[in-house]
Curated annotation (Swiss-Prot):
Gene: tpm
Pfam family, one: TPMT
Disulphide bridges: none
EC numbers for this chain: 2.1.1.67
The keyword Membrane is assigned to this record: no
Positions annotated to bind S-adenosyl-L-methionine: W10, L45, E66, R123
Keyword S-adenosyl-L-methionine: yes
Protein name: Thiopurine S-methyltransferase
GO CC terms: cytoplasm
Localization terms from the record: Cytoplasm
TM helices/strands, residue ranges: none
Record-linked InterPro entries: SAM-dependent_MTases_sf, Thiopur_S-MeTfrase_Se/Te_detox, Thiopurine_S-MeTrfase, TPMT
Entry keyword set: Cytoplasm, Methyltransferase, S-adenosyl-L-methionine, Transferase
Length: 220
């Protein structure tokens, strides 16, 4: 998926991946991370997710990363917030109480840019990327996050041969192969998401599972 693909999707309003409501898995499983008050939380490929406002409401400081300026501006306008906008290198940084969104290439971010984030939340980043970029994404996430951190990861698992992504299928075997080396992976939830996806039903997909994981970085 090239940057132009996602830019065009946002400009055209083709954002079926966007959830208008706060994700239920986030609300149910986020407390398992046991974060300190005012923890900085990285939300990669954040779009204009309502989940960010929920995290702010939990006392977190959200650090979003998003390629599309349209998505970032929509987030703040829909919440009636006027952000302070500054330029930091190749990024435009939109900041308001409890949140900052770095608008630009996620893969160009550094840990110095985003500060000390002790947790991350990924509902729609990993599954948005094809296999080759997923490996690069995991490496970038590890470069951005500190030695002691954890996160909540939500994935989809389905027969990829029946449906062309995004969203892509990220089965447990992929996580075991490419994530488990540096992270302890605990599955905390799973449910059938097939009937909430008209695209999958139309394609004849017979099984679509949403899976929820808590990831904790292994101490070396």
């Amino acid at each position: 998926m090239h940057a132009d693909f996602w830019q065009q999707r946002w400009r055209a309003g083709q954002i079926g991946f966007h959830q208008a409501q706060v994700n239920q898995d986030l609300q149910q499983y986020w407390p398992r991370l046991g974060l300190a008050p005012e923890a900085r939380v990285l939300v990669p490929l954040c779009g204009k997710s309502q989940d960010m406002s929920w995290l702010i409401g939990q006392g977190c400081h959200v650090v979003g990363a998003e390629l599309s300026e349209t998505a970032v501006e929509s987030y703040f306008s829909e919440h009636g917030v006027q952000p302070q906008i500054t330029r930091q290198g190749d990024f435009s940084v939109y900041a308001a109480p409890g949140i900052e969104i770095w608008c630009g290439d996620f893969f160009a971010l550094t840990s110095q840019d985003i500060g000390h984030c002790t947790a991350f939340y990924d509902r729609a980043a990993l599954i948005a990327l094809p296999a080759d970029l997923r490996e690069r994404y995991v490496q970038q996430l590890e470069a951005l996050m500190p030695r002691e951190c954890n996160g909540l990861l939500i994935t989809l698992d389905y027969d990829q041969s029946r449906l062309e992504g995004p969203p892509f299928s990220v089965p447990p075997t992929w996580l075991q192969a490419f994530v488990s080396g540096n992270w302890n992976i605990t599955k905390v939830g799973e449910h059938d998401a097939l009937h909430s996806s008209p695209k999958a039903l139309k394609a004849g997909v017979e099984r679509l599972d949403e899976q929820v994981y808590v990831l904790a970085r292994k101490l070396r």
